[in-house]
Amino acid sequence: MARSMKLACVVLVMCMIVAPMAEGAISCGAVTGDLSPCLTYLTGGPGPSPQCCGGVKKLLAAANTTPDRQAACNCMKSAASSITKLNTNNAAALPGKCGVNIPYKISTSTNCNTVK
């Protein structure tokens, strides 16, 4: 548990440093806060928790403009890069497992500039 919290803090700090946001865009702090309950699933754990899916749905609702969606994408891309044991299949499957559709794949290789 302590290790998960430490990793979540590292992800939060990395997102704030690596992905500066345009004015008015969703913040990396909000993205990582919403998705921090997903860390166990993203590193190969069992299916996403209700708290994780709640965060995914909250993030989807908050990212309602193209700049917000691009900012959220960049934050998730940066966060994914900093998770050393990221299970890429779980990351890509997360939205579907939570019953939502996002307009891009959660991946370190996603081109967030193409997100509309």
Curated annotation (Swiss-Prot):
PROSITE patterns listed in its UniProt record: PLANT_LTP
Task: List GO BP terms, alphabetically.
Answer: lipid transport
List the CDD domains hit by this protein, alphabetically. Answer: nsLTP1
Q: Which cysteines are joined by disulfide bonds?
A: 28-75, 38-52, 53-98, 73-112
- The signal sequence is 1-24
Q: Which domain of life is it from?
A: Eukaryota
GO MF: lipid binding
- Annotated keywords: Disulfide bond, Lipid-binding, Signal, Transport
The free-text function statement in the UniProt record for this protein reads:
Plant non-specific lipid-transfer proteins transfer phospholipids as well as galactolipids across membranes. May play a role in wax or cutin deposition in the cell walls of expanding epidermal cells and certain secretory tissues.
The entry sums up its family as follows:
Belongs to the plant LTP family.
The protein's name: Non-specific lipid-transfer protein 5
Name the source organism.
Answer: Lens culinaris
